[in-house]
């Protein structure tokens, strides 16, 4: 097993994370470096369970402006797709404001609706007392686009590019990233686990080798660049995730 431990913000005054500098306050509910990253391979029993829980051929319905997303259209140009039903149905949006207005009324859990309402009410400059300095775009704190209680995956590093977003349910759910049309398989590059408890697992399905999995801790944890997370068979976890358990 490979275990890569990352410093928590409570332990240090400031920390540099993959080109992103975080100067945190000491509030317990503010985001910071992930508490720990664990990458390993699944046992045959675990692998069978994960594969049985998702079927990539069973496509998720995705909607944008009231119409089903064309699988050939790359989300019809939308930037954000959010799970809005326990059956996996996704709604896609052009902006965070548009998404949060919808989610404040229609998200599948009270916690998710509350998170969207908080995001709408928050002032952009004061959403969190954390200063982020990102390459080429120092003024934007992109991780804040992910509302409270949600799990978010971005297509690019530093919380940029297209984003998939899932609410927190009473029990964990597993989704195959190939269920989305078009697929988000092998595209994830950064993540924010914006909740205090229950981490997230990412899986890479392999042929002829045990499937690697990556555990990302909870606790409002930021993972800005998967290229810096070691992959079991060499290289990094960037553009490797095939499924997510959230």
Residue spans for each PLM region:
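Hydrophobic helical h-region of N-terminal Sec-dependent signal peptides
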Residues: 8-16
């Amino acid at each position: 097993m490979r275990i890569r431990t990352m410093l928590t913000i409570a332990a240090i005054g400031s920390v540099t994370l993959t080109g992103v500098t975080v100067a945190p306050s000491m509030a317990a509910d503010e985001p910071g470096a992930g508490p720990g990253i664990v990458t390993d391979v699944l046992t045959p029993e675990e692998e069978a369970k994960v594969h049985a829980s998702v079927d990539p051929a069973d496509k998720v319905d995705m909607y944008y402006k009231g119409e089903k997303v064309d699988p050939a259209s790359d989300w019809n140009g939308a930037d954000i797709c959010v799970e809005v039903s326990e059956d996996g149905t996704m709604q896609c949006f052009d902006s965070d404001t548009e998404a949060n207005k919808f989610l404040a009324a229609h998200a599948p859990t009270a916690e998710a609706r509350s998170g969207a309402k908080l995001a709408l009410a928050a002032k952009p400059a004061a959403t969190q007392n954390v200063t982020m300095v990102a390459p080429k775009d120092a003024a934007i704190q992109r991780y804040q686009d992910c509302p409270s209680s949600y799990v978010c995956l971005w297509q690019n590093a530093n919380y940029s590019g297209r984003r998939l977003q899932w609410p927190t349910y009473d029990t964990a759910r597993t989704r195959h990233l190939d269920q989305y049309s078009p697929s988000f398989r092998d595209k994830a590059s950064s993540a924010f686990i914006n909740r205090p408890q229950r981490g997230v697992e990412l899986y890479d399905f392999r042929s002829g080798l045990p499937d690697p999995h990556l555990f990302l801790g909870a606790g409002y944890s930021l993972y800005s660049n998967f290229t810096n997370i070691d992959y079991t068979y060499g290289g990094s976890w960037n553009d490797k995730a095939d499924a997510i358990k959230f």
